[in-house]
Amino acid sequence: IYSFDGILISLHGHSPHWQKNIIKIKDEERGEVVTWKNGDKTLFLNDDLPRHFPIKESSPPNISNFSPESIPEEINFIPVSQGLEFFFDLEHKYDIFDLIKKGAGDKYSIHGEVTSPFDYLLNLFGIERAMVYLVQEPSKSKEILQRYTGGVKKIALEQTQHNIDAIKISSPYAGAGFISPAFYKEFVLPYEAQIARVVRDRGVHVYTHTCGAIDDRLEMMVEAGISGIECLDPPPLGDVLLDDAKKRIGDRIFIKGNIDPVNVLLLGTEEIVRKDAEFRIEVGKPGGGFILSTACSIAPHTKRENVQVLRRVAENIN
């Protein structure tokens, strides 16, 4: 339909028997509500990420009496969003990689994904409390980050054994909307750099996905030893100007993104999308290292025709 040339495996470890855990599915105007055997409910929205409602709310731990050693060496879940944790079926941890490779062959670029240790920290304590702990308990926060880093590295290394072309480090909370450049350098960079290093040592490319405003930390992101950066949201969603980013870091890593997924792709006409895509290619193409893409995810209500324009523009410009 869209002629994309890559497949991102953002979740893995699906149980082949997951449907057996469902008690009831109820259709609502906003989407489907699934009730699970343990009593939890998940609202699968028509136009947004799922929202999970556990039957019993659990309070996050307090860092003062939390032991970093209590974090298992082998991480068994992905902190997806809004408190939802996706747990692996350890007997089928990477089945999806092999299934996709079998179906796609060498026709598509296949990417795995791991989550930044910083996200695991935020998931553990809750975003607001975790941010406070960075100020109040920086040393212990780093111990926890290092513990999670070990587990994420293990997942990344396991993914490299499944014929993938690259691994994405999902790090959506590491932009200027959440932390300063100084905090990025202290609490994000050292840990993502460790992940990048072990992946690159396996001969697999690795790139970082950070949403929003990242103009003030582009060079620091490159210091992690990554192969590329994804998103580079332009104003007003972010603050990255493609020509400036290209001059500053384009000779060291690849750049993927910079098309506004809201104001251009969702709200724009086909002509607006065409002109914007042509501009991004004109700026990004010289010297290579630019991948035409939306800055972040495509909004659910985006017209199919607008997305299809991107492929036509890429083919016409060659």
Residue ranges and their predicted role:
Residues 13-81, 106-107:
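A contiguous, low-structure linker/loop signature
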Residues 1-10, 158-165:
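Catalytic domains of carbohydrate-active enzymes, especially glycoside hydrolases
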Residues 6-11, 109-113:
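A structural signal for short, well-ordered beta-strand segments and their strand-loop junctions
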Residues 55-318:
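Active-site loop segments of alpha/beta catalytic cores
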Residues 3, 28, 93-96:
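Generic hydrophobic, aliphatic-rich segments that mediate packing or membrane embedding
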